[in-house]
Amino acid sequence: MKKIFQIALFSMFLLWNGITMAQTFTNPKLEKLTTIKRTWGAGAQQDWAIYGDSLYRFYDKFAFIDIINVKDLHNIKKEYSIFTLLNDVAVHCNDVDFSKIFYKNDDPLPLVYVSQRGDSCRTNVYRITKTGPLYTVQLVQTIHFKDAEMTTTNVDETGQYLWIYSNGPYGRSYSKVKIPALDNKNVSLSVVHDAVKRVRITISGVGQGATVKGEFIYHLHGYKNQGTLAIVDLSTGTEIQKIDLVNLGFKGEPESIAFRGNDLLIGDHGNFYRLYDAAATSINTTALPNRTIINTDYNLAGQPVSKDYKGVVICEGKKIVRK
């Protein structure tokens, strides 16, 4: 209990001082949760995204979306399969992410951003609605990345930006662009001129599914028997951890990845895994470089206090008693 309290206090200190934490894995372990076979006729499983207690599993060609209940990770079950009526070989679904944008206030789900086949350099934006037991999927926008090469996209945690993973024109990189308004059905963005931030990376291997948490991206790479997970600091492009999934028992092609709380769910073609940390805590702290830390003292309520304050204070990450 004492160690948990110390970790909580240190985490609060980092947040107060503008330092972002990355969830890394000191002693990574992989637990197989279940197998749910693909929907008949659906094609190959690609990425998935989680909203609430439901996981949405996407397939290549975007013909089907499976809705899978993940409220209890040891009782995962498929509830429904949506037939999209939008079968398109270009929409590979290599990367999918829910945004925080609702097309209409009473929609059951926010808009979902779906990467097309990498060489098409486009991302589709879909609206999913429900009438009774029936779901309807509507294409509301296509974003064209006119000067990029082999793109996938992820929505950042604020819901205001997209991170574009691209093999060019700056080598392999992530570029951050403002999510465009929905006024036009077709929008062109430039990773050269429209990016508000860009970081170059040195990750090797073919990119698969990815997900963003805080200022870090968790990106799967490789084909069957080659799977790795790269955790990259999006402020610098630094790969802060690389996990060999094959050594942990993952033999398939790593396609799907999403967080549910602190549980990182990874999938291949039908199998569900949980990546977790066998150490005391699964939260390690990674400070962003070149951040100025102001040495302010706080009371236990998180309020700044002066040097004359008497009582228990948090000073430079440590709990002390001033008399």
Where are the regions a protein language model picked out?
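Structural motif
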Residues: 62-69, 119-129, 169-180, 225-232, ...
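Blade-level signature of beta-propeller repeat domains, shared across WD40, Kelch, NHL, RCC1
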Residues: 252-279
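Loop/turn-rich, solvent-exposed surfaces of beta-rich toroidal or solenoidal domains
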Residues: 194-234
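Residue-level detector of functionally pivotal "anchor" positions at catalytic/ligand-binding pockets or at interdomain
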Residues: 279-301
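Beta-strand-rich domains and repeat architectures in extracellular enzymes and scaffolds
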Residues: 34-63
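Surface loop/turn motifs at the tips and blade-to-blade linkers of beta-strand repeat domains
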Residues: 36-41, 82-89, 141-147, 197-204, ...
